[in-house]
Every structure is written in structure tokens, then in C-alpha cells.
Amino acid sequence: MIKKVFRRFSSSLMIALVALFSVSCAYNSKRIDPATVYGGSNNSTYSRISDDNTPSYSQVPDDSTRNSSKSLAKKINLTDKITYPIVSVTNNINPADIKERLSKTVTVMMVGDILLHMPIEETCQQEDGSYDFSSLFANTSDIISSADLALVNQEVIIGGEELGISGYPCFNAPYPIADALVDSGFDVICHATNHALDKGSRGIINTLNYWRTAYPDIITLGIYDNEEDSKDITVVTVNDIKIAILNYTYGTNGIPIPKSMPYCVETLDKDTVIADLDLAEEIADFTIVCPHWGTEYVLHHTSYQENWSKIFLEHGADLVIGTHPHVIEDIEFYHEDGHDMLCYYSIGNFVSWTSSSGKGVLNRVVGGIADVTIKKDFEGKVYIESYDIIPTVCHLEPVTNGVSVYPLELYTEELALQNKISKQDSSFTLDNCNALVQDVWGGSCEMKFPETE
């Protein structure tokens, strides 16, 4: 693993250097020029297995191959060029100010399931037969694109029209949903879900081919069309913080893994998960796990999820953001042997339109955007500085306002009355949406950890 020069400075050495510069500058009455340090690597993948038992390293394509509407070159530190702030050195230097200036932060956001039931597909289909899914994210894209690193759980496979567009129970989405995800600001697409094999191996191949062709800079996780890629874990560098991101599903709805592609879906296999976490602990500063787990429509995490969260904690995971239950679940903070881990057990559906009716359907259109700030302090220690949850509601009104997700705080009584889900669940009201959030999450408020010493 390539080390960056500036990381080798200890706090005591840095303070000594600052003191030395102070004396020199006071004597010469000169201003210190900014220091620029180069070195390191781009976004990287590291192999679980190599001939000499060391991580393998590969570099992502250069910027000339990138054609996303939102290039990661602006967000993920592709040059690894670290420029220190200009500091006028005097005899009255405040070390705390220098430490704060040299610290780094990364804002990570993630949304839950993009579950494209047929009424959504039909609403987003244009008169000429093409698809436009931009309305789904029209009221949240500003939030999503503000993150340094934005993740989404793409619940259904994106196999394209050649495999037949379909909804429940075997989903398949057209390619334009990928366009809408990128245009809305997402950088990382989690594909390890129970619907990953709804269209067999062909669905996975089509999905990955489209991502590689249309958006080669977008990071996809959880599905593979070749064995070599399946041996890797993904590590991205954002603002000089190396972040490993792992994605697994509990299963594939009983659809067997193809014998010709036994590696095609990342599942919650204990040995594999532990090996990935241990490798991430060696090569990354911070590890995010995105498990597709739990029991559908249950508003609190299960013992199955808790058992897995203990494994994640024991092997160094720092942040867990769960999906699959199709409803929101509790958020827990764990501490063991000096290690902290934040766990969002389920952030619910982001986009969905179930055909079910009756009490509880309301719960399936309320979700949340996980919002976490990661900090790397002056001494190189990386930890969660603060976290938040931004409640959302999926508005379903094909004729007038279409299908779109709103932050709950911007949702109105008028919109709630127009939401078609109220025809399927008479308890759907704005007040009841807020009550659900209050019951499960205690409302939407920013939560801060005490700063790590």
C-alpha cells in the first residue's frame, strides 16, 4: 500500500517544526510559502487473494475516460494532491487553529431502496416509449449532490428493455434509471439485493455493461460478471480519507446462484465478510458496510441483524447502513474495546409503489437519507464526527405531480391529500408520517459524538 508523506508526521514532530519555523520567520521577517505534498493513489480496488498474500493494487481510468454528468474528479481525490493552507507564522500561533485547518472531513449520504414497481415505470414512460426517471429525484437531488460521497441501494436489476421491463415479483428496470441516478448525484451504486438474480446472470451482465459503457467512473458494488473483480474490495479516497465500502445481501429469493457464475452476487457469507473486513482494516482509514438484511415490514432490527452487526463491530467496521425491510428501523451506536460503530439498521424505501393495501402501507413510503460526517484529525485519527437522518416520503400522483421523493420537512398537507397511497392505506396523513419517524427515530435531529481525544 502506498503511503502519503504527510501522514508520517507525528503531532509532536509537527509542533516542533512549527516552532522552528516561527523562530526562523520572526528573525527573517518573512512569510512562509504554502507547502504542497504529492503522492499516493487514486480510487483503488484491493484483492482479497494474491500470490504473495498482499493486497493487489490497480488504478482507475484517467479523467479522459469519464463522461458522467457529475465527475468524481471533483469529489474523490483523483490526483491525491494535498495543499496545505497558507499560514502566516508569528510568535502568537494557536496550535488548535493549525490542527483544525489540517483536519479533513467527508460527508457521506445514502438513500434506501429504489424499488421500481410497474406503476412507477408506467408513470415515467414518455409518449414516445422512452423513459425519464428524473422526477423521482427532483426534490432531493440538491441534498444528494451536496455529499462528498453519495450511495444508493438500487434494489432492482437494470437489465434493459431487451429482457422485458417488469415489476413485482421479478423486477427489471430500463437503463434510463441509471442516468437519473447519476444526474441526481450518486457516486456508489449498491446492487447486492434479493432481486439481483431476478433476470438471471444476463441481468447482471447487462447491468454492469451499461455502467461500464455509459458511466465508467461510477462505483458499482455487490454484483460481478467476472471472477477477478469478485476477489476485490473497493476503497475510495475522498479528501485524503481512504474509505472501504462493502455490500452484501442475505440471499436471492430462492433463485440459485448460476453454476457458471458462482461469484456473481455478494452474499452474507461469514468467512468472506470477515476476510473483507480484516483486509479493509489494513488498507483503509474507515469502513462502511451496506448489508441487505432483516425482516420485511418490521420496524425494529431482528436478532439476525444484531448478530451480524456484532461481527461487523468485532472486525473493525465503522459505519453500517442497512436496507431491505422496506420500512425504517432503529439507529444504534456501539462501542467495544475502544472501537465505535454506528448502525442504521434500515433506512427504508426511497422509491416504491406497492400494490398492497391496508394498515402499514404508509410505512413503505417513508424512508430516510443517512447523513454522516467523517473526520480525520491533525494526528491522522479517523472517526465519525456527527450523524443525522433526513426523513423522506415518496409522493405518488401520476397525473399532476408524478412520482417524486420529498424531504418530509418540505412535504405539505395538500400533497399528502393528493398522494395515491392514501387510497391504499386510509391512515396515510402527514401527521402519521411524522409520528412514524418520531416513534422509530425520535424525529430528525443532528446527533454528535464527543470529539475523540
Residue ranges and their predicted role:
Residues 2-13:
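Bacterial N-terminal signal peptides that target proteins for export
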Residues 7-8, 48, 66:
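Basic polycationic patches enriched in arginine
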Residues 12-15, 277:
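Generic alpha-helix initiation/capping and coil-helix boundary signal
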Residues 23-24:
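C-terminal motif of bacterial Sec signal peptides marking the signal peptidase cleavage site
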Residues 27-34, 38-39, 57-58, 62, ...:
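Acidic, metal/ion-coordinating pockets
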Residues 40-48:
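Short extracytoplasmic/periplasmic juxtamembrane "stem" segments immediately C-terminal to an N-terminal membrane anchor
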